[in-house]
Design a protein with these regions (language model features):
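Short glycine- and acidic-rich boundary segments immediately preceding or forming the N-terminal edge
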Residues: 9, 40-93
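Bacterial signal peptide processing site
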Residues: 4-7
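Short beta-strand-to-loop junctions in surface cap/lid or active-site-entrance loops
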Residues: 93-102
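Active-site/substrate-binding loop(s) of hydrolase catalytic cores
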Residues: 79, 85-87, 101-228, 241-244, ...
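His/Asp/Glu-rich mid-to-C-terminal helical/loop segments that flank catalytic regions of hydrolases
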Residues: 259-295
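Extracellular mucin-like PTS domains
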Residues: 15-45
Length: 295
């Protein structure tokens, strides 16, 4: 059984956006975002096939059994779109899996480039794609940080403190994509604090409570708000599309090398690759069960 509490001190979580809405077209058949098919045509921006692959980074080699954010599964997404470019001109991609109609969930796999445990959830979602809802998966919002093994993007911006100014191209891309697909729920993945938070609505609170129960935790936190000048990603997303609901999943880390530059390491939770893999599997299964109720 879980109770709701204010968010504990954060290691950090944010995002950034580029004006990309004009580069992806979406057929609108209803005013209800849930019933609108997601974009199934690629961005009109010309990209090479190699830009649709997440670059190898620190997370690929952190420890035995660790992995990066590239697709290791034999499964292929329904579509892949480029939602923008990073500060270092790397493509930021979004993969669509599962249903094209009905509930749509947006999962942001990595925001800080030195947080590697979220790759296990990304891998789990690809290995066992959803059957009863649509999934938009952004493997990493911060390909520069992933490549460099840094918390920030190529210009030193912490994307999860960019919710107000939305100055980074990565944040701009995410916000434009949020406007475009209007997800029913957004899931942000982080490490290494090992807790669950929710923001802005009954669906998010319900899914958060189910995750807390399934993971054997005691408390569901509210994700909280930073002062406007350092607004979190979910605050920026809510400003772009009012009423957007989100879940923050802070995973335990797979290594003490993970998130070395985090603002506050006093609450770090260290685990093993095996246990983080189980955590990721539970996240995938809980999302699947929760979204069945929205069909």
């Amino acid at each position: 059984m879980s109770c709701t509490s204010e968010m504990p001190p954060l290691n950090g979580e944010t995002a950034v956006v580029s004006s990309v809405a004009t580069s992806i077209s979406i057929p609108s058949t209803s005013e209800n975002p849930t019933s609108v098919p997601p974009p199934m045509v690629p961005s009109t921006t010309q990209v090479n096939d190699d830009q649709l692959v997440v670059p190898v980074g620190m997370c690929d080699f952190m420890t035995e059994g660790s992995m990066g954010f590239g697709n290791r599964s034999p499964n292929k997404p329904d579509s892949v779109v480029v939602i923008g470019k990073s500060d270092g001109n790397l493509a930021i991609i979004a993969e669509h899996w599962g249903q094209t109609l009905g509930p749509q969930v947006l999962v942001v796999g990595q925001i800080h480039g030195d947080e590697c445990a979220p790759a296990f959830v990304v891998d789990e979602l690809r290995e066992r794609p959803p059957e009863n809802y649509g999934l938009w998966l952004i493997p990493t919002l911060n390909p520069d940080g992933h490549f460099l093994g840094s918390r920030t993007n190529g210009s030193g911006i912490d994307l999860n403190r960019d919710g107000l100014t939305q100055s980074a191209p990565e944040t701009k891309a995410l916000m434009a994509f949020t406007r475009l697909v209007a997800p029913d729920l957004t899931v942000y993945l982080h490490s290494p604090l090992n807790w669950i938070g929710y923001f802005n609505g009954s669906l998010a609170q319900k899914v958060g409570s189910q995750l807390v129960s399934a993971l054997g935790m005691d408390v569901l936190y509210t994700s909280g708000s930073n002062p406007p000048e350092t607004a979190f990603l979910w605050q920026g997303q809510n400003a772009v599309v009012p009423g957007q609901q989100s879940i923050l999943i802070e995973m335990p880390s797979i290594s003490t090398k993970e998130a070395p530059a985090a603002p506050n390491r006093s609450r770090d939770s260290f685990s093993t690759v095996e246990k983080v893999s189980v955590f990721a599997s539970i996240v995938r299964d809980t999302l699947d069960e929760a979204m069945k109720e929205l069909e």
